[in-house]
Structures are given as C-alpha cells and as structure tokens.
From Swiss-Prot:
This is Probable protein kinase UbiB. One of its GO terms (molecular function) is ATP binding. SUPFAM superfamilies: Protein kinase-like (PK-like). Keywords: ATP-binding, Cell inner membrane, Cell membrane, Kinase, Membrane, Nucleotide-binding, Transferase, Transmembrane, Transmembrane helix, Ubiquinone biosynthesis. HAMAP family: UbiB (MF_00414). The lineage of its organism: Bacteria, Pseudomonadati, Pseudomonadota, Gammaproteobacteria, Enterobacterales. GO terms for biological process: regulation of ubiquinone biosynthetic process; ubiquinone biosynthetic process. Is probably a protein kinase regulator of UbiI activity which is involved in aerobic coenzyme Q (ubiquinone) biosynthesis. The gene is ubiB. Residues 123-501 form the Protein kinase domain. GO terms for cellular component: plasma membrane. NCBIfam families: PRK04750.1 (NF003404), UbiB (TIGR01982). It comes from Blochmanniella pennsylvanica (strain BPEN). It is found in: Cell inner membrane. It comes from the Bacteria.
Amino acid sequence: MLVDELCRLYSIIKTILNYGLSDFVPTHRLIFPLRIGSRFLLRVLNKHSQLTLGERFRLALQELGPIWIKFGQMLSTRRDIFPDSVADQLSILQDRVAPFDGIIAKMCIERAIGNSLETWFKDFQEIPLASASISQVHSARLKKNNKDIVIKIIRPGLLPVIKIDICLMYRLAKWICKFLPEGRKFKFSEVVSEYEKTLFNELNLLKETANTIQLRRNFKKSQILYIPKVYVDFCSENVMVMERIYGIPVYNLVALKKQKTNMKLLAERGIEIFFTQVFRDSFFHGDMHPGNIFISYKHPGNPKYISVDCGIVGSLNKKDKYYLAANFIAFFNHDYRKIAELHLDSGWIPLDTNIEDFECAMRTVFEPIFEQPLEKIPFSKILLYLFNTARYFNMEIQPQLILLQKTLLYIEGIVRQLYPNLNLWKSAQPFLERWMRDQLKLSTTICALKDKIPHWIDKIPELPNLLSHEFKRSCMLQKKIEILIRELRTQRTNHGQALFLFGVGATLVTSSIFLYIQDKYLKIFSIFLFVIGIFIWTIGWKRIIQ
C-alpha cells in the first residue's frame, strides 16, 4: 500500500469511527478479536449517535468528498443492499463543489484545442454556468456563426485522487467479502467495478460526445425529445463543446404552468421517451434526473423535452428486453407462474430453483399491492420488489437492470410531479404489448434468420474441429477441478489461523489509534502498540491473500 493510500485510509477509518458506521457490521459474524474491538472501541468514538444510521452514512460520504458522494448516489438505487431508510438518505446527496478558477478553465480549453480561445470563440464567461465534482460548464459563442454554445471542462488534477479512492474502495469491498459472508451475496467488488466504469466514462468527454451524437441520431425527427448538437471538431477527452439550449427546468412547475404547458401530454411523453429508448433503440440515457431535463419554450400546447449530460447511458440486449416486457405484462395479468418461468428461462435465477416456491413468494409480495388502485402503484417499486424477491432465490445482480431501475425511478418521479393523476400502467401497457407482438411477427423472425444464416454457413466446415476441441477442453477442466479441490482442502486448514492473526492485528491498530486520540500520557505506548499491530496484521493479511 502506498503512503498516499495509507493516509487516505486513515482518513476513511477516522470518518467511519466518527460517524459510528460500524453499525452496518453484524458483530456476531466477525471473528473474535474484531468482535471485541468493535464492541468496546468503535462505538465509543461515535460522535453522532443521536442521528439515524442513514443520516450518519450520508454525512460521512459528504465528509469524504465528491467521489464518495457520487458513489453514495449510485448506492441509493441499490435498495437490494440497503433498507429504505438508508437509501432515502443517500438519494438526497448533492454533488455540489466550489467551482475552479475561470482562468484555469480557459487554459484547459486552449490546451485541448491547441490554440488560443479567441481564435474560435468569443464572449467566453469565466464564471461557470454550473459546477460539479467531475466537471464544470462555461458559456461562450462560436466566432464563425455567432451561435450560443456551452463548453464542458473536466476538473483538472482529478485523476490521481480518483485512482487512490477507487483502489481503497476495492480493498474495502474485498475485506467485506472476506469477513462478512453476507457481503459475498451482494458482490461489492462488482458494485465498485460498475462505479469505476461509470466514473471513468464520465471522465472521458469523447464518450459523452459519442453518446450524445447517438441519442441525437435516434431522436433526429422526434417531436417529443430534442438532444443538442455537439461540435465534434472542438471535443477531446477533457473538453466538450455543444449547442446551448434554452428551456424551463422540468422541476419548475410554476414556470411550466405559467406558460400554459399541457401537463398531461408532457407526462405521457415522458413515459413514451423512456420506453422508446429502452425497447426501440436499446440505448437509453442513464442519468435522467430533473437537473438534466428541460422543456422547450416553444409550443407549450405540444411540449417537447430537451435532455443534456449524456455521460451515462445503458443498453439492454434483445433477451433482456423480451423478459423485462414479458414480466411487466405477466404482472398486469397477475400471472405469477409466468413471472417465475421467465426468471428461470432468462438465467436470472439458478436452474435448481424451486419454481413453485418462487411463484408463491411473488404472489405473497404482489397480491397486497393490487389492493391499491392501479394508477397509484409505482412502476419503479414493482421492479424493485421483483428484484428483491428474486434476490432471496440467489438472483445474479444485473448491472444493466440496476441502471434501468434508477432511470425508471427518475422518470416516474418526474412524471408524477408533472401530472399526479396519470395512470402509468395505462400509458405503458399498449407500448409493451405492441413491442411483444412485433417480436413474434413472421417478418421479424425471417429478418433475424437472414442475419444469422451467413454466420452459420461459415461455421459448418469448422464443426469437427470445434467438437474435438471442446472434448479436450472438458477433460482438462476435469483435471483442474480435481487439483482445485485438493488446494481448497489445504487452504481451509490455514485460513482460520490467518483470520485470527489478521483480527488481532486490526484490533491492536484500532486500540492504538483510540489510545493516541484519547490519552496524551500513553502516546508512546500507543505507537508501540500500533507497530506491533501492523506487524501481526501484515502476517495475517499475507496468509489470507496467499
């Protein structure tokens, strides 16, 4: 571990102790030394015991900085991991940071375009229009045509900080999986990996440029959604130049009503945009929170959405789309057997799952929901209940479905705010049923076969070699499994001792920090204790990772 990582780890541990986040850890599942340490030391240092666990978690992430705030925002959609009380607190995290100097922004732009800013732009505003943890946005004009534009710039010096924090997130995820059996079920390393991928996509504005161009192409002739033009010649990894849009923020209901916007039609079009992106295009905007959506000033009776900030996008393959649509339709029809069969056929739950038990669990969860009027049943909650119930049957985490759930949560929140009486199910059902009918048409099947036939013909001469190769590979795999079983038996013997040493070392380190903070007369002893703890911890850690 590097010195920078150790310093940052100390800061993280201190924040965890200050906010009493040890409450997330079920102590009965810890090894003995860590159980003693958590009981007698961690809770003593909790300076915010009067707050709820969710509030403490939110404040801790805020204190750790913007990268952790964004991580918390992502975790807020993972209600399969956290209870609602915690997820609700995480959902109000605000990604707000002080802007960096406009002169520095100007220098970043000039470095990216390889020329002085005045060569291509005029009326550049040093005070940003918006500032966030990853980037900030400045307004200007293009010299050649006098068009209003915005210039998005990645915050300088961000990469080294992000790399350290991501590395520590991986370490924490690994420790959770080592010491908490429940942690393995949630695959925290995969959660961090998904966050890392999202974060680095946002750091590369060329990816956002490509996403924006694709979405603009998909809705080029649309009367319901407008995506602003990107000026590709000026775009790079750190700078993006695009058309400036003018519209009313979707959350400004007063302004929308003042210009006599057709709110019912606007809400219906929000649902239409979502399902069009998911089922027609298989390419959807994954960050459609209210801050990224505007309504055009033109034609309030025939309202049009404007969407920006396309750094995060998602896609579903044909199989996922089919099973998702079929699940919703089965839900409309109270067909829980069909829902169970779909989960099994899609591979979302293990093949050895008892289908009757799964069907019964679905009925138990959803039948009470149907006591409410259909228009009051939230789409996003149905998806959440569906995933949470399936989780108890060891459903694999599907990252693309998590992003879809987050997007649906945003869209549904916006739509219900615009027109509370809208029946989302009535709006969505015809769309889903039409899409399902289209998939079953003979013409659709013929088109799919025409696409695959050349590939099949090409592979026919290779079949004998492929079969021989697969037979050899299965024999090799059998031998590897036998070797692995022998190695696992050996490792199991040593693992308990390694965990004990690791736990003793961690407890001594925690105790030394506590003594160092609390008692000025025991500072030398606490340093001595810290060194011994690190030594024992290192021995245990090396044995664990071997």
